[in-house]
Amino acid sequence: QGTIGIEQLAEHPVMLTPRGTTFRDALDQELAASGVRLTSAAEVDGLRLLASLAYQGYAPALLPASAVSGYPEGDWSLVHVEGLARRSVGLVRNRRTTPSMPSRAARDVVLEVIREIAPHQPGIHVTLGG
């Protein structure tokens, strides 16, 4: 596992998700603020398909770390891109109502799975508050 800066990344064509997808739009906005523009080797709809193509060696791909977990070791490597903000994932509920028992049970299971599995996933940083 290595590290590359966003300026270095811009020197190479990479496979990306298409414009109009949440991940790509957030990425383009963040890179534009840094004055960096990427060259697309291909635009592929679907993070798992994009990860699979990169794993098979078609071209490097820019993906969230969660999209590449589970691939066996081989002739590929996970490279951290410095200069990109970490993405956050949250669990949202309405504060004006009391959560139902099934909602609370689902929340508890989600938190348990995150605490158990996420720390073992490369590139995933757990920041649970409670």
Label the predicted regions.
Residues 1-2, 26, 71-73:
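Short, charged, surface-exposed secondary-structure boundary motifs
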Residues 2, 7, 42, 60-61:
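Residues that recognize and position ribonucleotide moieties
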Residues 2, 19, 23, 42, ...:
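Residue-level signature of the cytosolic catalytic core of signaling kinases
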Residues 5, 13-34, 99-108, 114-125:
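Secondary-structure junction motif
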Residues 8, 48-98:
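Beta-alpha-beta core module
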Residues 16-17, 36-49:
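Short beta-strand-to-loop elements that line the ligand-binding cleft
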Residues 33-36, 71:
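Short helix-capping segments at alpha-helix termini
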Residues 126-130:
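C-terminal regulatory/oligomerization modules of transcriptional regulators
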